[in-house]
C-alpha cells in the first residue's frame, strides 16, 4: 500500500514538473522588440502594437518616444530594433543613412496651433516666418487683438522642428524661445498661455487649442495629400539593415490594409496610399 502511494506521488510530481516545464518553454518562446523615437508617430505605433498583440499572443512591441534624433541614433547603434523618425535619415547629422533601411508607414501633417483667445484665423508663410524669427511680436500686427505673441518652439532633436524649419523658416534663424520636445506638452502649454503659438502633429490636435490656416488652406488630410498644406512629413520606421523575425512581422503589419485603411486614418494620420505627391530627402515635391 505504501509502495502504491509512493508511485502515485512520484507520478503526480512528474506530471507537475512536465506541466511547469511546458509553461516555461511557452514563456521562453515569448518575443519582444522595441520601437523608439518620434513622438509624432508614437500614438500610431502604440495603437497598431496593441492591435497586433491581440492576435499575436506572446509577441510584444515596446513603444517609446524620445524624438526622431533619439530613434535614429538608437537604431543605428543597435540598441533597439526600430527607430521612428519624422526625418529622412539623410537629414540627421551623425547618422549613416546607407546602413539603415527606410520603411515609410504614414504621413503626418503639422498644424499651426494657437491659444484659443487668439482671434487670428489665417497667416501667410511670410507672416509665420516673421513671427518665429521675432520680427512680428504682437498679434495686432497680423490683424488680431493687442496681445503679445508667445512662441513655443520644438527641441532641436525633434523631427517636427526640422519639418517646420525646412518648410517655413528656410535660411532664417528662429528667435530664441521656450522649446519643448513632447507634442502633448506643447499642446498643454499653448492651451494655457495667452497669445501662444506653436505647431503640432494632426494626431494631437483637439478642441483645447485653435488652428490657423496657411495661405488660405486649412490643416486637413485632403490638403496634405495634394501638398496644398505644406507642413507634412513622412513617418519613417528605420531598421539597421534588412528586417527579420518579429521586426519584419510588425513592419509588414504597419503597411497592411488593416492599418493603412483604418488605424492610420482613425488616429489622425494620412495613409501612404492616399498621397498624390512624393517628397524626397531634399524636400523636393513631385506628382506621384
Swiss-Prot record:
Alphabetical GO biological process terms: phosphate ion transport
Leader peptide range in chain numbering: 1-22
Designated gene of the protein: pstS1
Topology relative to the membrane: Lipid-anchor
Main location: membrane
Oligomeric and partner information: The complex is composed of two ATP-binding proteins (PstB), two transmembrane proteins (PstC and PstA) and a solute-binding protein (PstS).
Protein name: Phosphate-binding protein PstS 1
PROSITE patterns the record matches: PROKAR_LIPOPROTEIN (PS51257)
Alphabetical list of SUPFAM superfamilies matching this protein: Periplasmic binding protein-like II
Keywords, in A-Z order: Cell membrane, Lipoprotein, Membrane, Palmitate, Phosphate transport, Signal, Transport
Covalent lipidation (N-palmitoyl cysteine), chain numbering: 23
Functional note: Part of the ABC transporter complex PstSACB involved in phosphate import.
Pfam families assigned: PBP_like_2 (PF12849)
InterPro entries associated with the record: PBP_domain (IPR024370), Phos-bd (IPR011862), Phosphate_ABC_transporter (IPR050811)
Family: Belongs to the PstS family.
Location(s) in or outside the cell: Cell membrane
PANTHER family, per the entry: PERIPLASMIC PHOSPHATE BINDING COMPONENT OF PHOSPHATE ABC TRANSPORTER (PTHR30570), PHOSPHATE-BINDING PROTEIN PSTS 1 (PTHR30570:SF4)
